[in-house]
Swiss-Prot record:
GO terms for biological process: regulation of carbohydrate metabolic process. Catalyzes the ATP- as well as the pyrophosphate-dependent phosphorylation of a specific serine residue in HPr, a phosphocarrier protein of the phosphoenolpyruvate-dependent sugar phosphotransferase system (PTS). HprK/P also catalyzes the pyrophosphate-producing, inorganic phosphate-dependent dephosphorylation (phosphorolysis) of seryl-phosphorylated HPr (P-Ser-HPr). Residues 265-270 are annotated as: Important for the catalytic mechanism of dephosphorylation. Belongs to the HPrK/P family. Its cofactor is Mg(2+). This is HPr kinase/phosphorylase. The active site is at residues 139, 160, 178, 244. Coiled coil: none annotated. The Walker A ATP-binding motif also binds Pi and PPi. It catalyses: [HPr protein]-L-serine + ATP = [HPr protein]-O-phospho-L-serine + ADP + H(+); [HPr protein]-O-phospho-L-serine + phosphate + H(+) = [HPr protein]-L-serine + diphosphate. Mg(2+) binds at residues 161, 203.
Length: 312
């Protein structure tokens, strides 16, 4: 099971530590769900989920402050259980002394942020969703081409890494080579990242392992990217029919999310990196409503209609 440490959340969201011994910052977070305790403050703890991060905004804080000191302390002691990873107070609100006392007794980190509660909740959920999502490892090269994530796949030795290197030289960015870890960020979005050991590295047969960041600079690499298009490279076969109009819809499904995939035949004399660039731009054009295949079809239909009229 994937997990995130409390200290990683602190670093990512730039939270301030009000109370937190070093060992408390090593606590694991195993769920991306967040709880904003409301009914719990009235003493209703049925269906309470203590394993989640507890986030307090202005409403929760105001109600808490309105309570008598002893009642405030008793409620907080019931909320703060050993499995609770941390408590975050938003908007830079002052943490009441009773909360600090309960946190010390129950060994729970108290954190604060100046961000608005809704914004903080969104950022926290997004970060935890991406970190805790199940990864699927696929073989290929993930490139950022014109701001679009393109997954290049194909048989071993077909030239995926060499194509990736050529794309880097043409100003695009390497995300991952050889192994791409992909996860579903939501129901319609795939995201890809490199394995930590392979980050910024690319392997070229006959040359060895190349550190792309060292050779080409920080602008040539990217730590992660949305995966929007898959390109499959395969050896050219005269007996096989390849799509020439772009109207054969094919998909690659990963983690229950499907993305379009195109097949590109590889043979001597073809500049594959340029072809992939064109494929990426063509996909983006389709997303914007410009479909060259449809335009060709309309022109062809119009030409046939005119010829039929002339020959009538």
């Amino acid at each position: 099971m994937m997990s995130v440490l409390v200290k990683e959340v602190i670093e990512k969201l730039r939270l301030d530590i009000v109370y937190g011994e070093p060992e408390l910052l090593e606590k694991e977070i195993n769920t991306a769900d967040i709880t904003r305790p409301g009914l719990e403050m009235t003493g209703y703890f049925d269906y309470y989920t203590p394993e989640r991060i507890q986030l307090l905004g202005m409403k929760e804080w105001s109600y808490l402050i309105s309570m008598p000191s002893n009642s405030r302390y008793e409620v907080l002691k019931k909320m703060f259980l050993p499995e609770t990873p941390a408590v975050i107070v938003a908007r830079g609100l002052v943490v009441p002394e009773e909360m600090l006392k309960a946190a010390r007794e129950c060994k729970i980190a108290i954190l604060t942020s100046r961000a608005a509660t809704s914004r903080l909740s969104g950022e926290l959920s997004s970060y935890l969703d991406s970190r805790l999502a199940e990864r699927t490892s696929v073989h290929g090269v993930l490139m950022d081409i014109y701001g679009m994530g393109v997954l290049i796949q194909g048989d071993s030795g077909i030239g995926k890494s060499e194509t990736g290197l050529e794309l880097v030289k043409r100003g695009h960015r390497l995300v991952a080579d050889d192994r791409v870890d992909i996860f579903a960020k939501d129901e319609i979005t795939l995201w890809g990242e490199p394995a930590e050991i392979l980050k910024h590295l690319i392997e070229i047969r006959g040359v060895g392992i190349i550190d792309v960041m060292s050779l080409y600079g920080a602008s040539a690499v990217k730590d992660s990217s949305q995966v929007q298009l898959a390109v499959y490279l395969e050896n050219y076969d005269t007996h096989k029919t390849f799509d020439r109009l772009g109207n054969n819809a094919e998909e690659l499904e990963v983690s229950g999310v499907a993305i379009p995939r195109i097949r590109i035949p590889v043979k001597t004399g073809r500049n594959i990196s340029v072809v992939i660039e064109a494929a990426a731009m063509n996909y983006r054009a389709k997303e914007m409503g410009f479909d060259a295949t449809r335009l060709f079809d309309e022109r062809l239909t119009s030409l046939i209609a005119r010829n039929e009229v002339q020959n009538a």
